[in-house]
């Protein structure tokens, strides 16, 4: 635990498409994890007696989603609505972590290949709107790799809104070989909703969508051999599981359990024409210098909530083995804490004494402007 008496302890804030993970450097897990969502009343005056609050953030917004219209300011990993994003940050610092920004350095995370103007805008907001004394922006996949104790490897980072394969050599991401796949948790939840309709269960409202997400997280898994698993599902009920809905009704889910995340390997199931996560990983490795490929094949690190399905590492291993040169040694690493490994990597980095010179200070920002971020964070 960090000693909160020490006012200079850094804040680590990982802004994902689906969830914000925030806390203090040196801690082993984020203190605050809440949905990246901002809600505003659909109709003026509906919420009388609630001090007419005009915006709700995170869990507060989720809980009132019936009367609010919800907006997600991060799309596919990249901030697209700065006003709402600022509200999320404000909520993070003042309501969740309850701190004074001017007393702490802050480490933020960004998606790989985040546009330059976005990094500058983020820097500007931290210094000008929140008055942080110093800041740093780390690439999510690189932080995940650090948290696994490596500095070289390829990270498959898959969250709620986007997936990336990021080859990293001695601590630096190789931008020319990074690939982005617009397929992630949200798409899987949507697909599960669709295939459950075949059973006659319909989920349309955002509240019901949350139920489907929960079913996905609790019951889905990845088959090592999809065809074989399908066969097993038709001949026996061994894979059937039950799930109790909030209203007490009990539903049964069978083949859907592995059909849903199969999309990660067979994107054609949802009508996409792109490579699955295994092929994208392989393509990323092939874009790298031939001399470092061996190091990448031997250090394939999974990261993010959408890599949490049981069976994913075995299947990934099997698929990469089928693509790679025959004698290549392949290792797929699925760290148990990978749901939060980006945050954990940030926590480790920001608490190293050797990291001190890396912070961008307010003085440097005042002198050089937002572009300073490209010189110090890469």
From Swiss-Prot:
UniProt-annotated location(s): Cytoplasm, Cytoskeleton
Pfam families: Actin
GO molecular function, one term: ATP binding
GO cellular component terms attached to this protein's record: cytoskeleton; cytosol
InterPro entries: Actin, Actin/actin-like_CS, Actin_CS, ATPase_NBD
Assigned keywords, A-Z: ATP-binding, Cytoplasm, Cytoskeleton, Nucleotide-binding
Protein origin, superkingdom: Eukaryota
Additional record remark: There are 8 actin genes in A.thaliana.
Job of this protein: Actins are highly conserved proteins that are involved in various types of cell motility and are ubiquitously expressed in all eukaryotic cells. Essential component of cell cytoskeleton; plays an important role in cytoplasmic streaming, cell shape determination, cell division, organelle movement and extension growth.
Subunit structure: Polymerization of globular actin (G-actin) leads to a structural filament (F-actin) in the form of a two-stranded helix. The binding of profilin to monomeric G-actin cause the sequestration of actin into profilactin complexes, and prevents the polymerization.
Family indicated by similarity: Belongs to the actin family.
Protein's name according to its UniProt entry: Putative actin-5
Organism of provenance: Arabidopsis thaliana
Lineage, uppermost ranks: Eukaryota, Viridiplantae, Streptophyta, Embryophyta, Tracheophyta
């Amino acid at each position: 635990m960090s000693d909160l008496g020490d006012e200079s302890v850094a804040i680590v804030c990982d802004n994902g498409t689906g969830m914000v993970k925030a806390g203090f450097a040196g801690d082993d897990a984020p203190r605050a994890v809440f949905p990246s969502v901002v809600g505003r009343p659909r109709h003026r005056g509906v919420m009388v007696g609630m001090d007419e609050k005009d915006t709700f953030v995170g869990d507060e917004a989720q809980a009132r989603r019936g009367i609010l219209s919800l907006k997600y300011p991060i799309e596919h990993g990249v901030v697209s609505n700065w006003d709402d994003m600022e509200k999320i940050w404000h909520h993070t610092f003042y309501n969740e972590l309850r701190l004074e920004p001017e007393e702490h350095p802050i480490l933020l995370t960004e998606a790989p290949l985040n546009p330059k103007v976005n990094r500058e805008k983020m820097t500007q907001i931290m210094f000008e709107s929140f008055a942080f004394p110093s800041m740093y922006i780390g690439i999510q996949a690189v932080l995940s790799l650090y948290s696994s104790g490596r500095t070289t490897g390829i990270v498959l980072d898959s969250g709620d809104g986007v997936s990336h394969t990021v080859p990293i050599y001695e601590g630096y991401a190789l931008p020319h070989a990074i690939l982005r796949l617009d397929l992630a948790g949200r798409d899987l939840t949507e697909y599960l909703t669709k295939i459950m309709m075949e059973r006659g269960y319909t989920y349309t409202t955002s509240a019901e969508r949350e139920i489907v997400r929960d079913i996905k997280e609790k019951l889905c898994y990845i088959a090592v051999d999809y065809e074989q698993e399908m066969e097993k599902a038709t001949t026996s009920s061994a894979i059937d599981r039950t799930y109790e809905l909030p209203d007490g009704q009990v539903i049964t889910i069978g083949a859907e359990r592995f059909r849903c995340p199969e999309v990660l390997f067979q994107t054609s199931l949802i009508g996409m024409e792109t490579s699955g996560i295994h092929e994208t990983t392989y393509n990323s490795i092939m874009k790298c210098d031939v001399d470092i490929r061996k190091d990448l094949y031997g250090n394939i690190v999974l990261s993010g909530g959408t890599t949490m399905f049981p069976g994913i590492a075995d299947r990934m291993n099997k698929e990469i083995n089928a693509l790679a040169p025959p004698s290549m040694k392949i290792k797929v690493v699925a760290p148990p804490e990978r749901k939060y490994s980006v945050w954990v990597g940030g926590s480790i980095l920001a608490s190293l004494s050797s990291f001190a010179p890396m912070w961008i200070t307010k003085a440097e920002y005042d002198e050089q402007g937002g572009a300073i971020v490209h010189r110090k964070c890469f």
